[in-house]
Amino acid sequence: MAMQLHAASPDSEHYVAKSPPPPPPLSPHPEPAPAFVKPKSPHVSQGGNAPVATATTPLTPGRVDRARHDHHGGGGGGDEATQLLNGIVLVLRAGAALLSFVAMALVASCRHGDWMDFLRYQEYRYLLGVSVVAFVYSAAQALKNFRRRRRGAADASFLDFAGDQAVAYLLVTASAAALPITIRMRSAVVNVFTDAIAASIALGFLAFAALALSAMLSRHA
């Protein structure tokens, strides 16, 4: 026991003092924390786990069509404007048919004998023929437009535009041809014959205006 105490005594010449371990060196530039690496694709699974869920909304066919329609037409404004134009064209053609029918009836009624007979004048015969053509064409076009609107089919076509222009040209030429002779007649005498012819000429000009406007609108529709 005495020998063990002697060996452990610090006065012993065999005693060696143990120094504490030195502290770790301090780095002047501490290493930054590892940055978070974002996966390349949200649909690629990491470590064999389930695919990562995303918040994207799938595009259904209805949404795709709506997006295309909004890009090109800006909503339903284009369709409403087209329907409005087609309705105006229908009214104009129906009005042209009515005006042409009344003008045709007035000219055909001018058979009062002697010089008060429209058959004696080439201008009035031409006016009657054009009024018949305008009435048949305008009534047929109005009926066709009405049926197509009920079916929801496409309305305007190049043939409709060209037909409106052609019949409108016939109406204005016939009315203009009958106007000078009628003015001369009315300067001499005013009676039922000259009044009926003057009214039919005025209706011919109105029918021309209706078909000309219909041609312009049908092209834009």
UniProtKB/Swiss-Prot annotation:
Main location, first listed in the record: membrane
Pfam families in alphabetical order: CASP_dom (PF04535)
Region described as Disordered: 1-78
Biased composition (Low complexity): 50-62
Domain of life according to the entry: Eukaryota
Cytoplasmic side: 1-87, 147-160, 218-221
Protein keywords: Cell membrane, Membrane, Transmembrane, Transmembrane helix
Localization in the cell: Cell membrane
UniProt GO cellular component terms: plasma membrane
Ranges of biased composition (kind: Pro residues): 19-33
Residues passing through the membrane, by range: 88-108, 126-146, 161-181, 197-217
Membrane topology: Multi-pass membrane protein
Extracellular side: 109-125, 182-196
InterPro entries: CASP_dom
Subunit composition and interactions: Homodimer and heterodimers.
Family: Belongs to the Casparian strip membrane proteins (CASP) family.
PANTHER family from the UniProt entry: CASP-LIKE PROTEIN 4A4 (PTHR33573), CASP-LIKE PROTEIN 4B1 (PTHR33573:SF36)
Record protein name field: CASP-like protein 4B1
Phylogenetic classification of the source organism: Eukaryota, Viridiplantae, Streptophyta, Embryophyta, Tracheophyta
